[in-house]
From Swiss-Prot:
This is Guanine nucleotide-binding protein G(t) subunit alpha-1. Residues 169-177 are annotated as: G2 motif. The keyword DNA repair does not apply. InterPro entries: Gprotein_alpha_I, Gprotein_alpha_su, GproteinA_insert, P-loop_NTPase. It comes from the Eukaryota. Residues 28-350 form the G-alpha domain. It is found in: Cell projection, Cilium, Photoreceptor outer segment; Membrane; Photoreceptor inner segment. Residues 1-21 are annotated as: Disordered. Residues 340-350 are annotated as: Interaction with RHO. Residues 320-325 are annotated as: G5 motif. It comes from Mus musculus. One of its GO terms (molecular function) is G-protein beta/gamma-subunit complex binding.
Amino acid sequence: MGAGASAEEKHSRELEKKLKEDAEKDARTVKLLLLGAGESGKSTIVKQMKIIHQDGYSLEECLEFIAIIYGNTLQSILAIVRAMTTLNIQYGDSARQDDARKLMHMADTIEEGTMPKEMSDIIQRLWKDSGIQACFDRASEYQLNDSAGYYLSDLERLVTPGYVPTEQDVLRSRVKTTGIIETQFSFKDLNFRMFDVGGQRSERKKWIHCFEGVTCIIFIAALSAYDMVLVEDDEVNRMHESLHLFNSICNHRYFATTSIVLFLNKKDVFSEKIKKAHLSICFPDYDGPNTYEDAGNYIKVQFLELNMRRDVKEIYSHMTCATDTQNVKFVFDAVTDIIIKENLKDCGLF
């Protein structure tokens, strides 16, 4: 009789111990949801987590990005060439017109993700043309990857035999996210599960089942999108779409108790753009100084004022540059401290 009881007690103690361990593990698991409109920089943040909190990119993984980088470079120059026609811009050198025609033809015939020498020579000649540069300066009037200038001005390096993409090359590469991508890593005794969700409108209906049990939402909005329209709808300003989306997320009943952090991203692109294009393009009521600080702060206020529960719910915001590893490292460190403070104080672990 006694032996049976003690075995039962032992089993009970073991079960209790396991339940306690499971509870601690759950308490240390952080579900992070990355949300934001298309091309705001969500996937770049995910790449940074791999660089900062995992082992970064192996040589093999870096080499896999070559095809993407070549594809991005070709898409960019083709977008500029097409815009030359729609914006009615003349080539600085009429010989470039033939180069442009040749390039269009080659783009349809080459193997995707490759960059033959003849093609890279044509692209480099086009990129140096004054008309192409004038068209590039008007990039907000058509759809162009943020990485266009980065890759096109460094194409000679990218096509050198034996080229291995650098971390920066990888960070600037762009593949549209479809579906949901999960990344797991540990930091400050926490186990993170980060979910990157496609930002284009057609992808958003896939978000809903990710919502349950989310610890923190990082909402990413591109500061530089204030003078741009959507890929999916050229009537809608990207900043307005981002504000609309943020409004629906931050005031959603699902997220009443969820920490929300706002990343105002692409501050590097914004700081250059604001020198040339006035914020009133997006916000006609804005009559403040058209400086990085004033305009940036005005955008931040537009987002934060959408929070209907300001008295009980604080939204933390950071200006970010997702391609800058040190900046992301610093900001994510601060975000983790917020998560610890907000969500884990109840479980007695911290």
